[in-house]
């Protein structure tokens, strides 16, 4: 388990200069399998976030290089873990894009979560789940419990997308309009940003007590 990382120099420079400090959202792409559909869903949701003038930092577990075996408490973290953790620590909110496998989420995602601790704390998280006959709801429910244990704040709204392969074109665009999902997407982003703003203010004014 790693400790809280240092502050982000770019963010500090922005504050010193008095420039607006945009919220930073880390989007975690959790599928690592060959031929995965996850990048299509992640591309689409990243565009929804950027339309709200957010900084979006995408972390792909397929290329992150996180070791499968966790280090001991007294062992130094590998460089890939330190780099990943720095980006988590700089985030104001998290979005986890995940498929549902056998009523749960990929093992690579659990491994990524378990490498870290304080990096998640006092920050909101939502889940964008997808599948074929399933919609990612079981994965989202389990992730809410896990992130709550890590002192993150799982928000009420999540997105679950069934038959995702039929909803998206290969480039991530919509093959057809889906007013219900579009409305749910807007509401989810609205709620995530409310919590991100509120919790960033809280973290700035009052040290978090784990």
Labelled PLM ranges:
Residues 1-116, 174-186, 190-194, 199-210:
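N-terminal beta1-alpha1-beta2 submodule of the flavodoxin-like/Rossmannoid cofactor-binding fold
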Residues 121-168, 179-184:
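Short, glycine-/small-residue-rich phosphate/pyrophosphate-handling segment
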């Amino acid at each position: 388990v790693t400790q809280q990382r240092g502050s982000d120099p770019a963010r500090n420079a922005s504050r010193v200069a008095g420039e607006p400090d945009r919220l930073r959202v880390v989007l975690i792409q959790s599928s690592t399998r060959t031929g995965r559909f996850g990048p299509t869903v992640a591309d689409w949701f990243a565009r929804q976030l950027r339309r709200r003038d957010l900084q979006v930092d995408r972390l792909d577990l397929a290329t992150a290089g996180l070791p499968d075996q966790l280090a001991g408490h007294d062992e130094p973290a590998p460089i890939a873990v330190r780099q990943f953790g720095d980006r988590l620590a700089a985030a104001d909110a998290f979005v986890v894009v995940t498929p549902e496998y056998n009523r749960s989420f990929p093992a690579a995602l659990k491994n990524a979560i378990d490498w870290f601790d304080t990096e998640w704390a006092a920050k909101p998280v939502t889940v964008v789940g997808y599948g074929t006959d399933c919609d990612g709801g079981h994965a989202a429910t389990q992730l809410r419990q896990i992130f709550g244990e890590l002192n993150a704040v799982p928000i009420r709204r999540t997105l679950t997308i069934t038959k995702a392969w039929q909803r998206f074109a290969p480039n991530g665009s919509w093959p057809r309009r889906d007013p219900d999902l579009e409305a749910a997407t807007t509401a989810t982003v609205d709620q995530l940003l409310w919590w991100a703003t509120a919790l960033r203010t809280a973290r700035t004014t009052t040290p978090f007590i784990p």
